[in-house]
A protein has these predicted regions:
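Extracellular glycan-modifying ectodomains
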Residues: 2-163
């Protein structure tokens, strides 16, 4: 690495006015970069989660995260998510929402106790975020991963009707 030249791309993004920015997944990098750039004002239940579908995110919003990780199971191929096996960290799938948590569950506590705690924590975080969304004029939902314009439009349309 010593002496290696790295090329960085810069992008001209339009300036926008926003009252609130929140992560809606799909992996850890959104929450990481929001925090790194001092833009992560509130912790989102979707921070650090792996999820593939905006439809699931909307359904969680609509249900106030009521069933979030209450029906869950250990992922058998955990190494695919966390690389080298970790004796403490457990990879857990929310069976109801097809979402994967790689940072919240540990081997030294039973799954049911942890899932109830994660659900309670997520619901408390969601109340704060929901209040902030409702009191904001301009909200930015940030997400990493594959982008489909039609799916994103539908998500934003549904969220705008919800709030």
């Amino acid at each position: 690495m010593c002496g290696q030249i790295c090329k960085f791309s810069t992008f001209e993004f339009p300036k926008i006015k926003t009252d609130f920015i929140t992560s809606i997944g799909s992996m850890c990098r959104v929450a990481h970069h929001l925090r790194k750039n001092h833009l992560r004002n509130l912790a989102s239940p979707l921070d650090w989660m792996i999820n593939d579908k905006l439809e699931v995110v909307f359904e969680l919003f609509k249900s106030d995260f009521k069933e979030f990780f209450l029906s869950c199971s250990f992922v058998k191929n955990a190494d695919d998510f966390i690389g080298k096996a970790d004796i403490y960290r457990q990879v857990v799938r929310d069976d109801s929402n097809d979402m994967v948590a790689i940072h919240y569950f540990y081997s030294y506590e039973d799954l049911e106790t942890q899932s109830k705690r994660i659900n309670t924590q997520a619901r408390k975080r969601w109340v704060l975020i929901k209040d902030k969304i409702c009191s904001s004029k301009n909200v930015v939902f940030m997400r990493s991963g594959e982008f489909d314009l039609e799916t994103s439009k539908e998500f934003l349309h549904n969220v705008s009707k919800l709030f």
